[in-house]
Amino acid sequence: MEALEQRIRQDGRILPGHIIKVDGFLNHQVDTKFLGELADEFAKIFDITGVTKILTAEASGIPLAAVCSYKYGIPMVFAKKAKSDNIEGGLYMSEIFSYTYKKTVTLICSKDWITADDKVLVIDDFLANGEAMRGLLDIVKLSGAELVGIGCAIEKGFQHGGDKLREAGYPLHSLAIIDQADENGFVFRKQ
């Protein structure tokens, strides 16, 4: 998506450790109008007819998934990274290694909110090595729900998480794939 690539070039920064910082519009300060454009793009890519849930991970995926949820009129569920006292009943759990936080976390989702009757569209802000996405896909599989698609705003192509998911046959589409990010700037994959 050309508009997203331009926004990354304009407002994105590259930090040590291949961290791509786009917190001025995507996942800290949020440009909801622009996220609406991303949601519109996902609606062109995926057949959202019949989708019953949008699933994402706490916390940075929430803004984009919430905008998609609002625009499509579909409930959003986010997998939590810590069990709180207000979660009751059965849980789906998947242990992942967080690239950003450099530690193992457990994604948790109440069995009340995703069931075998659901058709799930997974939406997230970033895809790097694929660990968080693997955890979300585990939750979909554990629930018995049908996976409709996986939409990511930005994929770090150089970390190959997306390539592995595509090779495994998952219906993944990223709006911008960055194949290189260094002192020379960003190099985007042609799609």
Regions found by a protein language model. Name each.
Residues 74-120, 186-189:
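Short, glycine/charge-rich flexible loops or terminal/linker lids adjacent to PRPP-binding catalytic cores
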